[in-house]
A protein has these predicted regions:
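N-terminal leader/linker segments that initiate helical-solenoid repeat arrays
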Residues: 19-69, 77-78, 86, 264-265
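Residue-level recognition of tetratricopeptide repeat
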Residues: 63-64, 96-98, 131, 135, ...
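Bacterial Sec-dependent N-terminal signal peptides
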Residues: 1-26
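Canonical tetratricopeptide repeat
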Residues: 66, 70, 102-107, 137, ...
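Alpha-helical adaptor scaffolds
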Residues: 105-110, 139-201
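Terminal, low-structured helical/coil segments at or just beyond the last alpha-helical repeat
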Residues: 21-28, 173, 222, 226-267
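Structural motif corresponding to the intra-repeat A-B loop/turn of tetratricopeptide repeats
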Residues: 44, 78, 110-111, 149, ...
Length: 267
């Protein structure tokens, strides 16, 4: 028995050392072909050069998930989704813990493949727990996906839980985007007074949030508060023109669900 334990210990140590060595080799490849090659180019105007560097790195080791993700990322930003997704699938294949939730995010916000996004996030929750990606929990993106699939009650429940969880488990943290989308679910469920109350919470955090003011104006109008609605809409228009908009990191590349557009305001 002692010999078996010793043998197992030695085998485990050998595996650990082998993985360490592999990680070091992969880091060298990433440095050579991403840091010192691809990143010398601007992928917006030099996509071919960027991709060639990464391809050369993958010839050295095709299992480096980060290089696959870096191949995918600029294509997503260029809205070439069908080119991008197979590369991201490769990243998930080789490192699901790191990249599957990111793929769920890309499906939710970029490709608008909401059922697929839900499937990715639910699978991540089973395997890794309800963690965070791109500033929000997996449940937040599942809720956004349900919102876009007109399953408003499911979205409402998840967003309410998300808001409550932040308050209780993250030292009273509140997020204006979370309140914005929770307010949207209330609006879609015709709970207009509740939506207004939620929007006010968002405005307490981000007083010039034009998207919230626009949707609050709609709820005010639908509850017969015409003068208040007119004033709120006027504020939304002015704040929008000043650039006070939905400020998630990726709004530069994609339109988020229910995001205020200039033409909504006659601009």
């Amino acid at each position: 028995m002692k010999n078996l334990i010793l043998l197992f210990t030695l085998f485990s140590a050998a595996l650990s050392f082998s993985q360490e060595e592999k990680n070091k080799e992969q880091e060298k490849i990433v440095e050579e072909f991403l840091t010192n090659c691809a990143e010398k180019y601007n992928y917006t105007i030099q996509m071919a050069e960027w991709q060639e560097c990464l391809d050369n790195g993958l010839k050295k080791d095709s299992t480096i998930a980060y290089l696959w993700q870096q191949k995918a990322m600029p294509y997503f930003k260029a809205r070439k989704y069908e080119i991008a997704m197979p590369f991201l699938d490769k990243a998930v294949k080789f490192n699901p813990k790191r990249w599957q939730s990111y793929r769920g995010f890309m499906k939710c916000i970029f490709t608008k493949s909401y059922k697929d996004a839900i499937a990715d996030f639910e699978d991540c929750k089973k395997k890794f727990g309800n963690s965070y990606v791109m500033d929000h929990s997996y449940d937040f993106y599942i809720a956004i996906s349900y919102l876009q699939l007109n399953e408003y009650e499911k979205a409402e429940k998840l967003l309410q839980n998300y808001v409550t969880e932040m308050l209780e488990k993250r030292n009273g943290l509140e997020h204006h985007t979370a309140y914005f989308y929770l307010g949207i679910t209330k609006y879609e469920l015709k709970k207009y007074e509740e939506a207004i109350a939620i929007y006010d919470k968002a405005l307490k955090i981000y007083p010039n949030f034009s998207d919230v003011k626009y949707h609050k104006a709609i709820c005010l109008l639908l509850t017969g508060k015409n003068d208040d609605a007119k004033e709120m809409l006027s504020q939304a228009k002015e704040d929008f023109k000043k650039g006070y908009k939905l400020n998630e990191d990726n709004v530069f590349y994609e339109t988020y669900p229910y995001q205020l557009q200039g033409y909504f305001l006659g601009l």
